[in-house]
Every structure is written in structure tokens, then in C-alpha cells.
């Protein structure tokens, strides 16, 4: 069995969020993460859309952390949109040291050319935002658990880098709801739009959610033609069924 799939899955824990994506697009949302490159692993809020490259047969554990609803898109299409696999590193990886050198170099240049400091900083930071630890601790629902992030086979979409507007926040600013909501709203312009043809799967939690979802498909997104809905209806599957059959 292939380890890698031809589909990238974006998971969510809520049915309403699944419908919202189908109505519009994949929106960037700030995600608070520890900076591998920062002394003390300070947290930063990163605007990303996350996907995973795992087959249906390996989804059970993933859904426990990220939800029982998902949209699976064609990997070939995602690559054309700039969706990229993350780089998994450990404490002894030379990439972290090289990255710190690049960050310090950018800051030194920024002191000489303050007009372009934000842009230089964002370019280097975007490199770090595509890194994740090979393994580490994940905080969820007030609990801290050691996990191997490498097993998630994560892919990410980040917003374009450029201009004077920084797309990320420190943890302190992220905890300020006004600043967090403002940047999430700003980043909506960079969301990943799609059409029905690139969807390989729509996953719901329960079998009895399939028919209501088909009814939703007929009423959302103007470019969902009758034929598209017929096609998408055949691509809906429940997590209950996946757990039983795969």
C-alpha cells in the first residue's frame, strides 16, 4: 500500500465549517506554534491552511486531533496553488542554525535599510513557518501530549510575502482578540479558492449526515452545477464507513 496519497485532506471539527469552506474557499487562519528557531521556543501565530498527505486507512488517529470532517483535494491541483509539504527537523538539524544565521543577517540589513525591514523579516520568517519539529508536545483541550508530528505528513499554504504588512503575530498580540480577528480578516483575501472538479472526497462524521450535505450542495456556490453536485455526491463518505472498511 502506498504511504503517500493522491489526495490532500483538510480537516475540521465542525460540520458548519465544512459547509462554510464549500460555500467559499479555504481561509487562512492564525495558528499558534512554537518557533523552533527562537530561544525558549517562543510562540508565534502563523496564517496557514493545513492539509495532510495520508491514505484513508490511516485517518483514525488523525481525526482524534483535528476533527471528523474533511475535504480531500487533488494533490496535483494543490501543488499548482503553492501548497507545499512542511520540513520536519529535530534539535540537531543544521537547518535551524542556518536559518538563525539568515534571520540575523536580515535584521542587520534591516538596520541599514529600515524601509524594507518588514519585508525582509517576513521572507525569512516564512521559511521557519514551513518547518515543524519531528516530534514534540501538542497542547489540546488543556492537555499536553507528546506526539510525532512527522506522522501527520503535513502540507501548508502560506499567504504571499511582500509589502510592509506582516501576516503573523507574537503570542501576546495573538491573545488580543481584536488584533487576532483583524489579521484573520485581512488574510481572507489570500484564501485558496477552488472548483468542484478538484474535490476527490468530502468526509462527514456520520452516515446520516450524507443526505443533508447533498441538499446543501444543491444550494451553495453558484458554480456547483447539477452535474457537479451529482459527481460530488458520489464522493461523500462518512468517518464511520472509513473506520469500518479501511
Residues covered by each model-derived region:
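NAD-dependent ADP-ribosyltransferases
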Residues: 1-246
Amino acid at each position: 500500500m502506498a504511504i503517500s496519497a493522491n489526495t490532500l485532506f483538510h480537516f475540521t471539527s465542525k460540520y458548519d465549517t465544512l459547509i462554510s469552506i464549500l460555500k467559499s474557499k479555504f481561509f487562512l487562519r492564525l495558528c499558534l506554534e512554537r518557533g523552533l528557531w527562537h530561544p525558549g521556543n517562543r510562540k508565534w501565530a502563523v496564517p496557514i491552511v493545513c492539509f495532510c498527505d495520508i491514505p484513508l486507512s490511516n485517518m483514525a488517529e488523525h481525526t482524534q486531533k483535528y476533527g471528523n470532517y474533511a475535504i480531500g483535494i487533488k494533490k496535483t491541483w494543490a501543488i499548482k496553488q503553492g501548497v507545499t509539504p512542511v520540513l520536519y527537523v529535530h534539535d540537531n538539524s543544521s537547518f535551524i542554525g542556518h536559518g538563525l544565521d539568515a534571520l540575523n543577517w536580515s535584521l542587520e540589513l534591516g538596520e541599514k535599510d529600515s524601509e524594507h525591514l518588514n519585508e525582509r523579516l517576513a521572507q525569512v520568517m516564512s521559511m521557519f513557518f514551513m518547518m515543524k519539529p519531528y516530534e514534540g508536545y501538542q497542547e489540546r483541550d488543556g492537555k499536553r501530549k507528546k506526539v510525532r508530528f512527522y506522522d501527520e505528513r503535513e502540507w501548508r499554504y502560506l499567504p504571499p510575502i511582500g509589502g510592509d504588512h506582516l501576516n503573523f503575530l507574537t503570542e501576546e498580540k495573538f491573545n488580543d482578540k481584536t488584533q487576532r480577528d483583524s489579521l484573520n480578516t485581512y488574510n481572507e483575501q489570500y484564501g485558496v479558492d477552488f472548483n468542484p472538479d478538484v474535490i476527490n472526497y468530502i468526509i462527514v462524521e456520520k452516515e446520516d449526515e450524507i443526505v443533508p450535505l447533498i441538499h446543501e450542495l444543491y444550494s451553495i456556490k453558484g458554480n456547483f452545477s447539477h452535474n457537479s453536485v451529482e459527481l460530488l455526491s458520489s464522493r461523500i463518505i462518512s468517518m464511520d464507513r472509513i473506520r469500518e472498511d479501511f
